[in-house]
UniProtKB/Swiss-Prot annotation:
Its cofactor is Zn(2+). GO terms for biological process: cytoplasmic translation; ribosomal small subunit assembly. The lineage of its organism: Eukaryota, Fungi, Dikarya, Ascomycota, Taphrinomycotina. It is found in: Cytoplasm. The keyword Metal-binding applies. Its main location: cytoplasm. A zinc finger (C4-type) spans 37-59. GO terms for cellular component: cytosol; cytosolic small ribosomal subunit. Belongs to the eukaryotic ribosomal protein eS27 family. This is Small ribosomal subunit protein eS27. HAMAP family: Ribosomal_eS27. Keywords: Cytoplasm, Metal-binding, Ribonucleoprotein, Ribosomal protein, Zinc, Zinc-finger.
Length: 83
């Protein structure tokens, strides 16, 4: 009897669909990111699951607002994931 799915070598797509604790190698899904302010182009480091409103240090505009999970970036803000 041959299994249709290889349990020891799962595909990357199937691992990303699983819950973070049920993956073959457990790991967090949160990250830090550099967010660029659309008004003054100042870069601020923000946590992806921030629980408070993040404000730009120089022009005091709102960069992201918290939701139940990940923080929502405001319109016009661009981000880059940090390594």
């Amino acid at each position: 009897m041959v299994l249709a799915v290889d349990l020891l070598n799962p595909s990357h797509e199937s691992e990303m669909r699983k819950h973070k604790l049920k993956q073959l190698v457990q790991g967090p899904r949160s990250f830090f990111m550099d967010v660029k302010c659309p008004g003054c182009f100042n870069i601020t480091t923000v946590f992806s699951h921030a629980q408070t409103v993040v404000i730009c240090g120089s022009c005091a505009s709102v960069l992201c607002q918290p939701t139940g999970g990940k923080a929502r970036l405001m319109e016009g803000c661009s981000f880059r994931r940090k390594n």
